Amino acid sequence: YSDDECRERYIEHFTARHDALEELRAFLPGIFAKTLLHAFYFMKPKDSEKLMDLLLQTSFEDSLPFFYPLRFVLASLGNPLLESVHLDASMFTYLSPKKMSAIGLPYDLGTFASFLNGFSQLSDFKTTGDYAGMCQVLTRVCRLLSEQIGLLNKEVTDRFGKNPNQLPFVWHIQAGRPQVYYNVAVSIIADVRKGVYKNQEFLPTPATLAEKYGVSLISIRRTIALLNSVGMTETINGCGTRISLYRKPLESLDLSSPGTRKSLIFYLMGLQLVTINVRTVAQESFNAITPERIEEIIRLYEQETQSRNYLYTHGQILKTVFYSHKNSEIRAIFSPLIHIMSWGIPLSYLGDSDMDAKGEELDLLISLLKSGDKEGFARQLEMNSWNILIRKRQKLMDAGLTDAETIRIPALEILNLASDSIHFNSH
């Protein structure tokens, strides 16, 4: 592209994303800071030294000044799913001097030097184990990021106007992108939850399923193989494939397929992402949950209490918390996690049952929801998610999924420290 063409593309990049950038900067500081705190906590000491080397090598001229340090820190969590959320958001803002100078906007190197200085301080705090001090620096760095996005947005809009064709932020899952058959499997699990397909009943023929979900017969066969491997369905020669949600030994989990292993690791990644962020989101969305929706959740919970099969209430509460949030970008980022959580349904029937534990946890959560205790509800939802992550991770490790060990359990003291020490005013 010529310089003029680049300039036009840069201008379009920002003017078409004004609304999304405002939404992103309204919530990113809290989510970023709390995620980075966990990432630093899990970072190995030798990686802290590597981070300092990376900071010294980071160039102001090439890209977002702290993009590479950010990616390095996030990698400590071992969760590409979570990493991709933050990296997409970072590149979405893309505050590079090249872009800004091309469209004639001032670029304050001092501001961006403070980002790198902040990461240097964070590395020092990691060495000394001062996570309270780390919270202060993370708050300052992430607040500055939000302010700079806002200033840039205003300057661009004042100078070039607001593009009427606004584009939303789109989260591209960069690592471990699901295949078509994975998405169809999740859709079928969702249809089981909705009662479209009932337990012990046969699914429609593969040809009918292919037409319904708009995929090839090969994809449907792979979908059925995936669902069979996790115990969601079973195929009977000459009869077809039926939903088979009943108690099975853990050994019946078939981990021979890479697709199955990948799907289950994906599930644990989603659980970790939820555990780290759900208290923040729940605190902000609690007051927007309608009385009608609360009644629906209570009815579902009471039905599951009668059967002692707590399969759907936790997921419906998560869905409600995410969808009730006023920030459209929060909804865009967290809504896909509802589908990822679906894999917990067949896992509940494999090996030892955790229904009693889930029942006790939901008792507490529902009582807090009824009472209107926002802080207590958000804290308990985080705790429930933390417990589920521990149980499911251990179950998959016991089944032989060794990669499950790479998904780290967030430390309770860090979850609590993040909640107590990292706060931002809403825009």
Q: Where do the language-model regions lie?
A:
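Short linear motifs at protein or domain termini
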Residues: 1-26, 167-272, 425-427
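Ordered, small/hydrophobic-rich secondary-structure cores
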Residues: 8-121, 342
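Helix-turn-helix/homeodomain-like alpha-helical modules used for DNA recognition
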Residues: 15-61, 129-143, 262-301, 376-386
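Short, structured motif recognition centered on aromatic/hydrophobic residues
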Residues: 24-36, 67-75, 81-97, 188, ...
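Short helix-adjacent coil turns
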Residues: 42-47, 57-64, 77-80, 110-136, ...
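Conserved amphipathic alpha-helical segments that form helical-bundle/coiled-coil interaction surfaces
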Residues: 46-97, 136-145, 290-347, 380-387
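C-terminal all-alpha effector/ligand-binding and dimerization domain
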Residues: 102-170, 174-175, 347-427
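Long compositionally biased, domain-poor regions of proteins
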Residues: 187-191, 195-196, 207, 212-214, ...
